[in-house]
Amino acid sequence: IPFLTGHDVNQDMRAAQVSAIREAFEECGILLATDMRTQQMINQERLMELQSCREPLNKGELTLHEFLESNNLALSCESLTHFAHWITPSMMPKRFDTHFYVARAPEDQLAMHDGYESVDSVWITPEEAINQEKEGKRTIIFPTLRNIEKLGEAASVSDAISMSKREEVIPVLP
């Protein structure tokens, strides 16, 4: 498939990986993609040039394929490590089958919330997030809280990635 890098991309997980990278770009402005002209992960300067594409992608006015092709990009699926898999209970009116990934954000890319799906952003530790949720200062839905707790077991991004590579991801259906 064009527009994907990494020969070891799990075929069964490809759609979930593509969705994860797309969502990260649309909602927080981080794009795990390689510039096909340079064969390098895009930097902040290139990311800023692509910011105007976030809203059209989100609204469905621009397809991901069109975005990647017109900007000479390939999604870096190999930079994702499968972290968790949550499935909404069957009694819920809206159901989701969601895979979560952990990845190192490119050092020179700065996250920016989109103002629609994510309207605020803050960098805090997992412990701080959990404490704020317990104190009623922050509302965190159950799957997110469990994922944050799991991330809190890691001492660093590298540790979280290593931990995720070692552990089998078991689907959770509360």
Predicted regions and their residues:
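Terminal peptide-recognition signature
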Residues: 24, 101, 148
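The catalytic Nudix box helix
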Residues: 1-76
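Short, P/G- and charge-enriched loop/turn segments at secondary-structure junctions
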Residues: 88-90
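Active-site rim elements
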Residues: 7-14, 131-139
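NUDIX/MutT-family hydrolases
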Residues: 66-68, 73, 77-86, 95-108, ...
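Hydrophobic/aromatic-lined pockets within catalytic cores
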Residues: 25, 29-32, 134, 152-156
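Core RNA-modification/binding signature centered on pseudouridine synthases
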Residues: 142-174
